[in-house]
Amino acid sequence: EESVDFGLKHQKLTVIKISENDNSWVDKLKDIDVFISCLASRSGEPKDAHCVDFKLNNLLLEKAKAIECAQFILLSAICVQKPKLAFQFEKLAFEERLRNSGLNFSIIRPTAYFKSLSGQIENIKKGKPYIYFGDGKLTQCNPISEKDLSLFILSCISDKNKWKKILPIGGPNQSLT
């Protein structure tokens, strides 16, 4: 568990690390006003995706409802717009559950992360394969930095224009192909 004080009156961020083998983290949820879930399966494989992208997020949602949490913010992914893979379907299933939960929510769908793309560039430099489709325009994206995404997520707490919405977000520059 890690606490961060933003220097704002009555505002504190508590990061809770979730463990599959230890449920003591559940007890730490009782005083939370806003849930921000950045959970995502590591492999994206069907079993992993169901357990994390749907079931674990759903457990958090049920806890949020039980303690009458004010808001639930979900970090999702832009790729769920045209789902083909198991993790995309699991994310969409949870998004639907969240939208119908009765809680105030924001669903954030970033286009891509600079960190992820830079890792792909390093792999290409090492001679590893990279697959793109057609002329590359189908996979173009406008990546966002971790800092910019974090600030956007936090802005969803107080910006009522971002409540009860699905919010695609990209970086400040032109799309990369």
Question: What is the predicted function of each stretch?
Answer:
Residues 1-3, 22-24, 67, 81-177:
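Oxidoreductase cofactor-interface core, primarily capturing Rossmann-like NAD(P)-dependent enzymes
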Residues 41, 48, 76-77, 110, ...:
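Proline- and acidic/polar-enriched loop/turn elements at helix boundaries
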Residues 2-67, 79-81:
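NAD(P)H-binding glycine-rich loop region in Rossmannoid oxidoreductase-like domains
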Residues 39, 77, 169-171:
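Short glycine-centered, acidic/aromatic-flanked micro-motifs in structured strand/loop junctions
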